[in-house]
Amino acid sequence: MTTPNKGNKALKVKREPGENGTSLTDEELVTMSVRELNQHLRGLSKEEIIQLKQRRRTLKNRGYAASCRVKRVTQKEELEKQKAELQQEVEKLASENASMKMELDALRSKYEALQNFARTVARSPVTPVRGPLTSSMGPLVPGKVATTSVITIVKSKTDARS
């Protein structure tokens, strides 16, 4: 005979003396092989066999559900970790992007300053200044300026922005 005890999680399946065993716990019922289960079921009534098999199926499903929950929680934690890492990377890339935009703007304004300076020099001819360096530099040609003066202008404009 079977005696289900619904209040106790470790349900014991009791048998009549003289059968294959005296009792089975939930853990034993779940962990035993089908062959072992069939040996224990010999001599029991059809109703008791159905109850034991149903109980075993229920317990196994409960175990599968528990492992599924653990797996789901683990996957959720892993996904949250990946999400946090990706958010950090997005923030880092956004910061790099902003920095590069600022650098690009600075380079663009330097470029525009150089263009404006080149236009100014091209429109108005430079009159040579007579001094000790004039003869060594050669004749000054309109539209051509020494590189150092261009760099000086660009640097001074950049320093003014800082």
Curated annotation (Swiss-Prot):
Residues 1-24 are annotated as: Disordered. One of its GO terms (cellular component) is nucleus. Keywords: DNA-binding, Isopeptide bond, Nucleus, Repressor, Transcription, Transcription regulation, Ubl conjugation. Sumoylation at Lys-14 is required for active transcriptional repression. Residues 51-114 form the bZIP domain. GO terms for biological process: regulation of epidermal cell differentiation; regulation of transcription by RNA polymerase II. Residues 53-76 are annotated as: Basic motif. The keyword Flavoprotein does not apply. GO terms for molecular function: DNA-binding transcription factor activity, RNA polymerase II-specific; RNA polymerase II cis-regulatory region sequence-specific DNA binding. Residues 79-93 are annotated as: Leucine-zipper. It is found in: Nucleus. It comes from the Eukaryota. There is a cross-link at residue 14 (Glycyl lysine isopeptide (Lys-Gly) (interchain with G-Cter in SUMO)). InterPro entries: bZIP (IPR004827), bZIP_Maf (IPR004826), bZIP_sf (IPR046347), TF_DNA-bd_sf (IPR008917), Transcription_factor_Maf_fam (IPR024874). The keyword Transmembrane helix does not apply. Homodimer or heterodimer. Since they lack a putative transactivation domain, the small Mafs behave as transcriptional repressors when they dimerize among themselves. However, they seem to serve as transcriptional activators by dimerizing with other (usually larger) basic-zipper proteins and recruiting them to specific DNA-binding sites. Small Maf proteins heterodimerize with Fos and may act as competitive repressors of the NF-E2 transcription factor. Transcription factor, component of erythroid-specific transcription factor NF-E2. May be involved in signal transduction of extracellular H(+). Belongs to the bZIP family. Maf subfamily. PANTHER family: TRANSCRIPTION FACTOR MAF, TRANSCRIPTION FACTOR MAFG. This is Transcription factor MafG. It comes from Gallus gallus (Chicken). The lineage of its organism: Eukaryota, Metazoa, Chordata, Craniata, Vertebrata. The gene is MAFG.
